[in-house]
Each structure stands twice: as structure tokens, then as C-alpha cells.
A protein has these predicted regions:
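Non-heme di-metal
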Residues: 1-303
Length: 303
């Protein structure tokens, strides 16, 4: 599927009513772990889409362009709510956290296996060792506080094993500043991989920043605090790989293309019919956003 060749809908047609935005959540007892981690990742992707467009809006002097951003951003926000609200009421904060760390080990492992740039692959492998330890430590907390083996949640899709000890992961900030990739010559997989992993890790960082202090006991709050600081390092580590010479509109195009790529991929693999319908709807909307980005890039930068 080439989203550039698909016939797009009108961007404004993507705005939906409240009933459509509020989804039917999955069942935590029967959900496939990969359905859950797709949801967690796409929540992060949509948060990145909304925040990127807010930053673009704040740094853009052209009100016509800002209106176009506001239109698609409203739909990104509806998408984020629909995806994030797939989480059920009876899933605890710590159970959700196990899902976040499942993403943090499964996603970079797959990206590293399919990454043609040796430097980027090394960056993925490096942080992966640290996220294994985060999963292991949260799994221990889940067993201690709720007497639930984390293996029940990940269903043996991933090994829960110690990684690089978290206590040894704290580094001076300068060490996270890696060399950026040249997107003018980079393989499309490298462009996608670096943007996907940065968005995914950013969502984990945001989750711990905002909810880590709400855990019900002091031991858990301390664990969330420490790992939240490592997530800051990981977001800096991965974000440094992105090409800083891309224009705002070039970055807009990359963001929309990434969303098309992920929604199509997840639609193809999804087993849950309810969640699959969400991926299908969002793919249609993102194809419209992509074509909007193409038109804006042509209009304002003649590219």
C-alpha cells in the first residue's frame, strides 16, 4: 500500500461526534498482549502528532498555514482519545505500566532487527538493555504489591529478565547527545524507525512524569521516579538521531507518513475486530492528513 497513491477524503470529514470518539475498551483478561502494545504505541504516536503540531503552530507566522494545522490537529486529538480510552476501567496503573515496558523492549528489538543504519541500530540495542531491567523491576513490584505474575500479562511474548542494572544507567546529560542522521540520504526505514522510537519513548516518559507520583505506596513512587529519569535520557538519546535540518513542513510530512505506515501495519496484523476498526478509521484519516501535508509542502516550499 502506497498512501501517496490512495484517494484521500476531505480532512474536515475526519472530525467525529462524541459517541464515535468514546470507544469500547478491550477486556484485560483476554486481550492479546500485542493488541495492548499497539494501543500504547499509537497513543504515543498521536500525542507526538498533537504536540508537534502545537509547536509548529507556535513557531509559524502564517495564519493560513496555522489554520490547516489546527484542523488536522483537532482530528489527531480525537484519535488520541479514541486510542487511549481503549484501556479498560479495571486495568490498574501498574498493569498498564507492564504494557508500556513491553513496548519498550519489543519495539526497539524489532526496529533494530530491521534497521539498515549501524549507528542507529547500536543506539536501539543500547537502550534496549536498560528497558529490560525496567520491565523486570516493575514485574517485581507487581508481584510484591498485587501477587500477579507479569508473565500473565505479556503471555510469554517477551522474557522478563534483568538487564543493565537501573542504578548503573544514570549518565551525564552530554552522553545522550548522539549524532543526527542525514535524512537526505537515509533509508526510509531509518527515518521511520527513529521517529517511531522517539515518539514511543516520549510517551513512556510522559506517562511516568504524570502518573508516577499517584502510585499508592512509597516504594512504587520511588521506582517510578527513578525510571522516569532514565526515560528522559532515552528520549534525548533517540531524539538526537532525528535530522535537525528538516523544515517544519518536511517534518509534518514525515509525521503523517509514519502514522499511515503504522496504522496500515497494525490493521493488517490486528486480531481484535473492535480495535481493528479503529486502525482502519484512523488510516483513512491519516491518508487525508498526508495528502494535506504534501499540498502544504508544495505550496509553501515548492517541494
Amino acid at each position: 500500500m502506497n498512501p501517496f497513491e490512495e484517494k484521500p477524503a476531505q480532512v474536515a470529514d475526519g472530525i467525529r461526534d462524541w459517541a464515535s470518539v468514546y470507544p469500547t475498551p478491550y477486556c484485560k483478561q483476554t486481550v492479546d498482549p500485542y493488541t495492548k502494545i499497539r494501543i500504547i504505541l499509537m497513543n504515543g504516536i498521536e500525542v507526538e502528532a498533537a504536540l508537534f503540531k502545537h509547536q509548529f503552530h507556535r513557531n509559524c507566522p502564517n495564519n493560513d498555514l496555522r489554520r490547516e494545522l489546527a484542523l488536522s490537529r483537532r482530528i489527531e486529538q480525537q484519535q488520541q482519545k479514541r486510542v487511549n480510552w481503549l484501556k479498560p476501567l479495571d486495568e490498574t496503573q501498574l498493569e498498564t505500566t507492564i504494557g508500556y515496558e513491553h513496548v519498550a523492549v519489543d519495539l526497539p528489538a524489532w526496529l533494530a532487527q530491521n534497521e539498515p543504519n549501524a549507528y542507529v541500530k547500536q543506539a536501539l540495542d543500547f537502550a534496549l538493555l536498560e528497558d529490560f531491567d525496567h520491565l523486570y523491576r516493575y514485574a517485581n513490584l507487581l508481584d510484591l504489591d498485587a501477587q500477579i505474575p507479569a508473565e500473565q500479562l505479556v503471555k510469554s511474548y517477551v522474557d522478563i529478565t534483568p538487564g543493565r542494572p537501573t542504578i548503573a544507567e544514570h549518565r551525564f546529560p552530554f552522553e545522550e547527545v548522539k549524532n543526527p542522521v542525514d535524512f537526505k540520504t537515509a533509508d526510509i526505514r531509518t527515518k521511520l524507525n527513529t521517529l517511531i522510537i522517539t515518539s514511543g519513548e516520549q510517551q513512556t516518559m510522559n506517562f511516568y512524569m504524570n502518573l508516577g507520583n499517584t502510585y499508592y505506596n512509597d516504594l512504587g513512587r520511588q521506582l517510578y521516579l527513578e525510571i522516569a529519569m532514565i526515560e528522559e535520557q532515552h528520549v534525548s538519546h533517540y531524539g538526537a538521531l532525528l535530522d535537525p535540518t528538516c523544515t517544519w513542513l518536511e517534518n509534518l510530512l514525515l509525521h503523517e507518513y509514519m502514522e499511515c505506515y503504522l496504522y496500515y501495519s497494525f490493521y493488517e496484523d490486528e486480531l481484535d475486530p473492535n480495535v481493528k476498526s479503529v486502525w482502519e478509521l484512523h488510516l483513512e484519516q491519516e491518508i487525508a492528513h498526508l495528502h494535506q501535508a504534501v499540498a502544504l509542502l508544495r505550496q509553501y516550499e515548492d517541494k
